[in-house]
Amino acid sequence: MKIVVATDAWHPQVNGVVRSISTTVDGLRGMAHQVEVVEPSLFRTFPCPTYPEIRLALGCGRTVGKLLAEFQPTCIHISTEGPIGWAARNWCVKNGAPFTTAFHTRFPDYVSIRTGVPAEWIWKVMRLFHGPAERTFTATPTLAAELQAHRLPKTHHWPRGVDLTEFHPDGPPHPAMVDLPRPILLNVGRVAVEKNVEAFLECPVQGSKVVVGDGPALAALQARYRGALFLGAKHGAELASAYRAADVFVFPSRTDTFGLVNIEALACGVPVAAYPVAGPLDIIGDNERGIHGGATRIGALDADLALAIERALRADRDAAVQEAVHYSWDRCTRLFLDGLAEPTCEILPRPPDGADAGNRHVSRKCTRDSSGLLFR
């Protein structure tokens, strides 16, 4: 099957959205699907306001349409609500091409936090963007219910995974953390206001606080919290070693849709302390034993983050590892594939040289066999 993924989030950006999309693309290619990624490096870009390290495509509308026509995709998936996402969405709507979208980020909440604009105003924009899609992919049932409450009822469950060959409890701890006073409390992620890292750094708890990540709030937090250790962004084996060195992983965000870092921590045998909000609730569970029926606690959720940390210190590290086993990227990729829009409607032919790429259709009926492959 030939799949186009249109996304404003791509390398060299470092965040959970990019990891989720790129890992899924790799998985699809490993299943012998042809995947074309329409991403910012294909265009002139400009720095995103307040996020200069994120580059947004400039004037990409016509080019995105031409690329979609040239690629001749069987299915189109639009991952983000940025310029590339809007260009792909508008092309699909104009040409009657079915497409799916994903809701990776609580964009209405983030905009409201940063600008004071009421979140409901942004939800109107989200309904406009996602409304025409065949389905909107969501990481958790809680997020699906939230979208349905905002009049976006067509959702598809697409969870996240963890690479268990990379994130596991066996291996050396990070050398910068081994001699720190215990307990060692770790936070990993973008260092930005919406991630609520300051709530972690303000927690009145004993031990050492370590922050792994980069972002627009890093310099200010480093200057203010000199007793914390800031290691910057880490990847792969070095990131896994940071998890292993920790006694508790602290996730202070109240706005994440999932929190991929939570299952990375669990895979390394590190219990999670978080607020009882969507994301942590969908991973740790109401009973704090994980959502897959574990017998002992893998973390702690509490409206008082300090209390959550204290309880998480007594959680079962082996149970945390066992819970993470359920998060297979192969399963996640197959669920992604299952949710793609059935390609039973019109798909544009490749335009001749110099022709408009936007207006000619040819109908192609497709059927899906049990393997997920399509035959015309």
Identify the role of each PLM range.
Residues 176-210:
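Conserved donor-binding/catalytic core segment of Leloir-type glycosyltransferases
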Residues 254:
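Aromatic "clamp/platform" in nucleotide-sugar-dependent glycosyltransferases that forms part
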